[in-house]
């Protein structure tokens, strides 16, 4: 058995610069800074998120309680993983923040508090020779003895989950309802490509571009992101006309990632305060977070805060040259696919991504509806047969019962069958004709 150390880590939103990082494992909110080298982004683009004094005061009052409620986890592991974990911990302690960011691909894993009530340490009963009760008779086997405690049904009891187990409920990456309007899909595609270009220029390791797509959160700032001018760059590849537009888009992405991270910690702290019975502090923190624009998960709704009229208005300033631009970079293509999946629910398979070469191909793969799975669906979508006066299309096979219902005889037939105690549908309790066996036919 070994005790896993709690390694302090910063937010998973974006990495911070090597100059200054304000982060501790105990502090519920951490100030994030720009994730870029000094050579790629100028000093004027660096920023930090300001928090109000009221929120800091509320959080500081709960830091000590959070430390008391922090739990440790024990597990049994072989010697090799233990040595690997120790080596990784030693490496992180000697590396700078910028070196850790590059080694981990540009992102930090978030250390989240698990709302579990862990079982206590096992206790042993006294030895038989130490018991002075003369009526005590030690058992020779476990048959018939009462079982006290144990781990057989520990995780089946709701009181062992401080939040009722909501933290462990499955949360899908993509929304359940897909966006099918082509006008919205084209605007979302343009935003995803602009963010992908900014991520390629200033962002993370090419191994995990989808991490950014999963933490950006709600799609705000549509006007500032979509209004950037796209064009065909060198060798016909897609690029932004102005270099400053890439920096603007990147800053918007970092701000959105920080907001998502702070909002998640804010909601976790509210749930923790409510579970401890500190309703006044939870209410104060809830009001302060709403002033900063934070929303609970139940209040977020759809990820895309964009209407059809707004999408049509945004498309008026676009040129048509960007549609013929080539997309060769796999980071841009893969990030755009994951970002679209996160916001619209459309999943672009690897085969489709491989065949996509230009923006127009990407748009066609996204806007074109999927092929119908049934022949009836294909006939319904076609406008030839349904428009004929003597043709009617049904979604399924027309049975004899359906034909009787069309002419109005089914109720009479059903009534007569019930009067004779015969099954209305199927054979009921009646077997097959015995005459078939006499005639030697197959049953």
Curated annotation (Swiss-Prot):
Coiled-coil portions: none
Basic and acidic residues bias: start-end ranges: 126-135
Residue ranges, annotated region (Disordered): 121-145
Cellular localisation: Mitochondrion
Gene Ontology cellular-component annotations: mitochondrion; ribonucleoprotein complex; ribosome
The keyword Chaperone belongs to this UniProt entry's keyword annotation: no
One Pfam family per UniProt: Ribosomal_L50
Superkingdom to which the source organism belongs: Eukaryota
Binding partners and assembly: Component of the mitochondrial large ribosomal subunit (mt-LSU). Mature N.crassa 74S mitochondrial ribosomes consist of a small (37S) and a large (54S) subunit. The 37S small subunit contains a 16S ribosomal RNA (16S mt-rRNA) and 32 different proteins. The 54S large subunit contains a 23S rRNA (23S mt-rRNA) and 42 different proteins.
Name of the protein described by the UniProt record: Large ribosomal subunit protein mL50
Gene: mrpl13
């Amino acid at each position: 058995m070994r005790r896993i150390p709690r390694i302090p880590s910063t937010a998973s939103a974006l990495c911070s610069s090597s100059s200054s990082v304000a982060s501790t494992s105990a502090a519920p909110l951490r100030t994030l800074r720009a994730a870029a080298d000094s050579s790629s982004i100028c000093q004027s683009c660096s920023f930090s998120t300001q928090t109000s004094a009221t929120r800091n005061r509320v959080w500081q009052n709960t830091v000590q309680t959070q430390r008391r409620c922090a739990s440790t986890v024990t597990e049994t592991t072989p010697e090799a993983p233990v040595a690997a974990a120790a080596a990784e911990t030693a490496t992180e302690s000697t590396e700078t923040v910028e070196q850790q960011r590059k080694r981990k691909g540009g992102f930090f894993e978030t250390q989240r508090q698990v709302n579990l009530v862990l079982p206590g340490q096992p206790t042993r009963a006294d030895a038989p020779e130490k018991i002075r009760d003369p009526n005590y008779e030690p058992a020779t086997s476990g048959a018939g003895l009462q079982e006290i405690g144990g781990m057989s049904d520990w995780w089946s009891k709701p009181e062992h989950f401080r939040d009722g187990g909501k933290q462990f409920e499955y949360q899908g990456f993509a929304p359940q309802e897909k966006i099918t309007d082509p006008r919205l899909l084209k605007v979302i595609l343009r935003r995803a490509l602009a963010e992908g270009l900014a991520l390629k220029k200033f962002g993370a390791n090419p191994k995990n571009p989808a991490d950014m797509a999963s933490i950006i959160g709600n799609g705000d700032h549509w006007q500032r992101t979509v209004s950037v001018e796209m064009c065909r760059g060198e060798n016909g590849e897609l690029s932004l006309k102005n270099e400053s537009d890439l920096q603007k888009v990147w800053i918007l992405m970092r701000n959105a990632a920080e907001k998502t991270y702070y909002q998640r910690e804010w909601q976790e702290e509210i749930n923790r305060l409510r579970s401890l019975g500190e309703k006044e502090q939870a209410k104060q923190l809830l009001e302060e977070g709403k002033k900063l624009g934070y929303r609970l998960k139940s209040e977020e709704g759809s990820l895309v805060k964009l209407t059809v009229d707004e999408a049509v208005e945004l498309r008026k300033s676009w040129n048509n040259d960007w549609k013929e631009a080539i997309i060769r970079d796999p980071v841009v293509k893969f990030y755009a696919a994951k970002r679209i999946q996160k916001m619209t629910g459309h999943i672009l398979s690897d085969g489709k991504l491989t065949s996509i070469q230009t923006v127009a191909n990407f748009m066609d793969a996204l806007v074109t509806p999927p092929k119908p799975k049934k022949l009836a669906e294909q006939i319904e979508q076609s406008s030839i047969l349904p428009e004929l006066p003597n043709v009617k299309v049904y979604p399924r096979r027309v049975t004899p019962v359906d034909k009787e219902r069309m002419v109005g005889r089914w109720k009479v037939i059903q009534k007569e069958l019930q009067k004779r105690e015969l099954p209305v549908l199927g054979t009921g309790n009646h077997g097959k004709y015995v005459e078939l066996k006499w005639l030697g036919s197959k049953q």
